[in-house]
A protein has these predicted regions:
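His/acidic metal-ligating clusters that form di-metal
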Residues: 32-45, 134-201
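Conserved catalytic scaffold of divalent metal-dependent phosphoesterases
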Residues: 9-14, 83-173
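Binuclear metal-dependent phosphoesterase catalytic core
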Residues: 17, 24, 31-35, 113, ...
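Short, well-ordered coil/turn elements that cap or connect secondary structure elements
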Residues: 41, 70-72, 101, 114, ...
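Metal-dependent catalytic neighborhoods of phosphoester/phosphodiester hydrolases
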Residues: 16-17, 49-69, 84-100, 130, ...
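Active-site neighborhood of phospho(di)ester-bond hydrolases with catalytic His/Asp-centered motifs
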Residues: 5-7, 46-51, 75-81, 105-108, ...
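N-terminal active-site segment of His-dependent metallophosphoesterases
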Residues: 1-70, 84, 142, 146-157
Length: 229
């Protein structure tokens, strides 16, 4: 039994889109993902950190979720900035039921438990007051509420946070998110979103008592990162 994490699968079976614009290592990435994800077993849990599919709606995402359905075990899903198919949790679960897709769970205003650890998280957002718009500020504040709701729901359990957007990288710190992680004594924080040359902006390792790690698929060479045994 193990807990894995990987973000940014960028599946495009129902909405073909070239991915090599993000770098040459995306060539043949579907085959790389299939091989990399083969380490996951039926007793494992995998957190998918957003940007799962390029589809614009759930119907168009059916082939991509059929592919995800082949990943064994429990799949916990959070939203990325390119998940335009994203709908309400009830519509997503109905879609999964109608298509025979099993063991997929939305991480949004809630938490899940793995071996005594709380899996918390939300999409996150970039916002800098001097450059942000009113829309960005509203989305950012909403994401802060969702993250704190997720953390609160876990009570006294030790917490691991999963985000799509990085809460810090070279030249940027999202102080509000970092303060929440500190306040709720989060041990580890995993994030995605950064690709190609942007990997060089990622900050990984210990910062203020929290361990950060980038788990975008191309950063991991399309192999899931093992968070816990």
């Amino acid at each position: 039994m193990a807990l894995y994490a990987i973000g940014d699968l960028h599946l495009c079976l129902g909405a073909p889109k070239p991915m090599d614009v993000f770098g040459g290592n995306w060539v043949g990435y579907m085959d790389k993902l299939k091989e990399g994800l083969s380490v996951i077993g039926s007793e494992d849990t995998t957190v998918l950190l957003g940007d799962l599919s390029w589809a614009l709606d759930l119907a168009s995402a059916r082939e991509d979720f059929a592919w995800i359905n082949q990943i064994p075990g429990r799949k916990i899903i959070l939203k990325g900035n390119h998940d335009y198919w994203w709908s309400t949790a009830s519509k997503f679960y109905k879609f999964c039921e109608e298509n025979g897709f099993s063991d997929k769970w939305i991480l949004n205003n809630n938490h899940y438990v793995y071996n005594g650890w709380a899996i918390c998280g939300t999409r996150g957002w970039f916002f800098e007051e001097e450059r942000g718009s009113d829309h960005d500020e509203k989305v950012f504040k909403r994401e802060l509420i969702r993250l704190e709701t997720s953390l609160k729901s876990a009570g006294d359990l030790p917490k691991i946070v999963f985000l799509h957007y990085p809460p810090l990288y070279k030249g940027y710190r999202c102080e509000e998110i970092l303060e929440l992680l500190k306040c709720y004594e989060v041990r580890q924080c995993f994030y995605g979103h950064l690709h190609g040359a942007s990997h060089g902006l990622a900050l990984e390792g210990q910062w203020d008592g929290v361990e950060y790690r980038l788990v975008a698929a191309d950063k991991l060479n399309f192999q899931p990162y093992q968070v816990l045994f």
